[in-house]
């Protein structure tokens, strides 16, 4: 029983974000379709070879996606919304891009599909749309083509396929209501056809991802797995793959399925290895997800070895990453600015492949010398002064219940704020960022590289802030923002100014489509050495008589969008960040900033996957936000922003944040999200996003008015704000001006109605 290793997937974007650059060049008309396809082929070939050279035995194929792997699955099944279809019914790469972003170099623009978070990660997927009577057929052969590519290169491979039940679970019904699970029998023939094609190619194992099996599923969904896999058995060996949590709740269902192997996440799940072994069929292969695919820390391989060694020789065993390495940066070796000590604490995707090779060899040979040597820096980190700060720990221990309470209830605060700001009905604002032009990015890059001194850099940023204020006043917006020209990323910027964080040069991970982020890493206790946003906010406010919002990223979002420490709880990290940003709120207020926005778009995505664990998370998540905000006086208006959220099941917690104004993403869901606020009788003010900033399409005045009219049917108009869905950083100025002008006009029309 020789143990082999494998990965569940590998980052797609390329070490230098080659895929992003190729996509955006193609969308802009500066590259041909063939040039784009060539970049994809080159990246796939490189990544397979890199994994192989790092010691991976069985390479994943089908993990590459031009936009998103769930969207790829939709195309595989021929599931293309009518508004995105080619006139001749064919599917091509532009079909995919129209679904993802609303437009492509060919075809008519149409509203993009809804986008939401992939389980509890920072990756976004395009939500499949289902209509009653829908038909499916194998049309998009990307998976088969890539299998052919890999086989031609001589690789030993394992195709990756999103499973049918999880695919349906992730989607939404459009039009006439019906149970989307009823489509299972309609999509299974396509899966059977794909598996038959893979069998023809000599494929032995297929990784079929069913991460929905880690959830507390409704009975009907859980019962659907058996007939689904009865239909899929027999053509190839199936590795049923779960990740992001444990499977103990659903183990009885899983063990009855006609598959040949099971992958479990032994990093994020609490499953007992011995229990898994005892309860799974004896002839099943067990793939042990021992290396964390979602973080950047070097693994303690001696600990991983001890966790699994008792199964050696007792059943077929593979060792693997916990999940796809999509969520990890690619290669630590190119990080030349990290000092040796900190660098020794990390492992990126390629290094994690190396860890799998070391672990495989130790388990096969019984020789633990190499894994003991690899794990030595982890012991040193546990005692490093770079990790522990006694003052932070002391302040955290001194928190009282009063620290997270505003001085007065909302009704009292709202009256004080109305008197202070005297805003019109339907007040207009934006979420924070304005277009990050080539000039702005160049300015920041020159400063970072040392090609520009601090004085000239600040002069340049000040000019862009001034331009943003002028643009907003010209458009007639009521509450302004400074535009965030100085910020590359809403989390990275704060991490750069807080002690306890470090940054990489090339630690990019995909967020959605061509968007990549470079998350900071929390390496130690968090504190604020000095004010972060005050100077720029104060400068922007000096340029106008209208209120300018102070802009902060909230503690839970900074935590969720960073690579966290693994030696303390997430609650501890969030509260440390909250205390640091609490001081920032006090300083902004003292500088005359009367409206302060604390963005928490990640509050919901941080929810544990098992609902039984939600209450504990929401309790400390809400407390962290309130700890951050509660220092504000009554006439200081606290805003928060959230996106990609389903709110109905956490409305108690949303209300408990006690923000004076909440702005939310609603345009792609056609204001459906407001149903939750209406049913809950949410008492504070709401800004439902009236257009989708992820698409370059400009909404008409009539479109925005119609959305606001829908909103006013659910929420009293006197408590409604008018704003885009999200920040405008990724958009260009022409479409930004046009969209905001229409938004302001719609608000003015409603005031006069």
Curated annotation (Swiss-Prot):
Q: Which cofactor does it need?
A: Zn(2+)
> Which residues bind L-methionine per the record?
431-433, 484, 599
One of the GO BP terms on file = methionine biosynthetic process
EC code(s) of this entry: 2.1.1.14
Can you tell which superkingdom this protein's organism belongs to? Answer: Bacteria
Q: Which Pfam families match?
A: Meth_synt_1, Meth_synt_2
Q: What class of enzyme is it?
A: transferase
Functional note? Catalyzes the transfer of a methyl group from 5-methyltetrahydrofolate to homocysteine resulting in methionine formation.
Q: What is this protein called?
A: 5-methyltetrahydropteroyltriglutamate--homocysteine methyltransferase
To which species is this protein native? Klebsiella pneumoniae (strain 342)
Q: What is the lineage of its organism?
A: Bacteria, Pseudomonadati, Pseudomonadota, Gammaproteobacteria, Enterobacterales
């Amino acid at each position: 029983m020789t143990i082999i290793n494998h990965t569940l997937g590998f980052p797609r974007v390329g070490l230098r974000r080659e895929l992003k650059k190729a996509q955006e060049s193609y969308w802009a008309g500066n590259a041909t379709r063939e040039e784009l396809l060539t970049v994809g082929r080159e990246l796939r070939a490189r990544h397979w070879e890199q994994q192989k050279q790092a010691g991976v035995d069985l390479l994943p194929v089908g993990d590459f996606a031009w936009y998103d792997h769930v969207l790829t699955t939709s195309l595989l099944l021929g599931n293309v919304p009518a508004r995105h279809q080619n006139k001749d019914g064919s599917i091509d790469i532009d079909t995919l891009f129209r679904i993802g972003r609303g437009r492509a170099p060919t075809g008519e623009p149409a509203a993009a599909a809804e986008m939401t978070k992939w389980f509890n990660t920072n990756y976004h997927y395009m939500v499949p749309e289902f209509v009653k009577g829908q038909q499916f057929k194998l049309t998009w052969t990307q998976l088969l083509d890539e299998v052919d590519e890999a086989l031609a290169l001589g690789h030993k491979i394992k195709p990756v396929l999103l499973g049918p039940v999880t695919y349906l679970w992730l989607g939404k019904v459009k039009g006439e209501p019906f149970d989307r699970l009823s489509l299972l029998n309609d999509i299974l023939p396509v899966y059977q056809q794909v598996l038959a094609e893979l069998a023809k190619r000599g494929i032995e194992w297929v990784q079929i991802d069913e991460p929905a099996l880690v959830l507390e599923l409704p009975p009907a969904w859980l019962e659907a797995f058996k007939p689904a896999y009865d239909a899929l058995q027999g053509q190839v060996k199936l590795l049923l793959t779960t990740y992001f949590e444990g499977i103990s709740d659903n183990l009885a269902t899983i063990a009855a399925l006609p598959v040949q192997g099971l992958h479990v996440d032994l990093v994020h799940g609490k499953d007992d290895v011995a229990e898994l072994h005892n309860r799974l069929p004896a002839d099943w292969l067990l793939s042990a997800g021992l290396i964390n695919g979602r973080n950047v820390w070097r693994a303690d391989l001696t600990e991983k070895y001890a966790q699994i060694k008792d199964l050696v020789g007792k059943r077929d065993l593979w060792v693997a990453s916990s999940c796809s390495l999509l969520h990890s940066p690619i290669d630590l070796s190119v990080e030349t600015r990290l000092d040796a000590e900190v660098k020794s604490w990390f492992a990126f995707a390629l290094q994690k492949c190396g860890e799998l090779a070391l672990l495989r060899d130790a388990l096969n040979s019984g020789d633990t010398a190499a894994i003991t040597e690899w794990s030595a820096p982890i012991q040193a980190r546990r005692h490093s002064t770079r990790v522990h700060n006694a003052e932070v720990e002391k302040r955290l221990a001194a928190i009282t219940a009063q620290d997270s309470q505003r001085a007065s209830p909302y009704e009292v605060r709202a009256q004080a704020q109305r008197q202070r700001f005297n805003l019109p009905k339907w007040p207009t604002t934006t979420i924070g960022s304005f277009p990050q032009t080539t000039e702005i990015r160049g300015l920041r890059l020159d400063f970072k590289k040392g090609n520009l001194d601090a004085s000239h850099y600040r002069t340049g940023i000040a000019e862009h802030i001034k331009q943003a204020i002028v643009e907003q006043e010209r458009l007639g917006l009521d509450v302004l923002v400074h535009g965030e020209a100085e910020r590359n990323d809403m989390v990275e910027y704060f991490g750069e100014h807080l002690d306890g964080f470090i940054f990489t040069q090339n630690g990019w991970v995909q967020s959605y489509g061509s968007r990549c982020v470079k998350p900071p890493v929390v390496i130690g206790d968090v504190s604020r050495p000095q004010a972060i946003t005050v100077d720029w906010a104060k400068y922007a406010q000096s340029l106008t008589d209208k209120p300018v919002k102070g802009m902060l990223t909230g503690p839970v979002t900074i935590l969720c969008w960073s690579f966290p420490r693994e030696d303390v709880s997430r609650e501890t990290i969030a509260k440390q960040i909250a205390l640091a940003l609490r001081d920032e709120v006090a300083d902004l207020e003292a500088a005359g900033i009367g409206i302060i926005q604390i963005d928490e778009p990640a509050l919901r995505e941080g929810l544990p996957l098992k609902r039984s664990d939600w209450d504990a998370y929401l309790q400390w998540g809400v407390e962290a936000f309130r700890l951050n905000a509660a220092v504000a006086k009554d006439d200081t208006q606290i805003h928060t922003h959230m996106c990609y959220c389903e709110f109905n099941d956490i409305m108690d917690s949303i209300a408990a944040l006690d923000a004076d104004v909440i702005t939310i993403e609603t345009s792609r869901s056609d204001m459906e999200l407001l149903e939750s606020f209406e049913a809950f009788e949410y008492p504070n003010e709401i800004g439902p996003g009236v257009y989708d900033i992820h698409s370059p399409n400009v909404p008409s005045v009539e479109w925005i008015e119609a959305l606001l009219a829908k909103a006013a049917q659910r929420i009293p108009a006197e408590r409604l704000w008018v704003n885009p869905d999200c920040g405008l950083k990724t958009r260009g100025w022409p479409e930004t001006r046009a969209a905001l002008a229409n938004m302001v006009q719609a608000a003015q029309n409603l005031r006069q109605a």
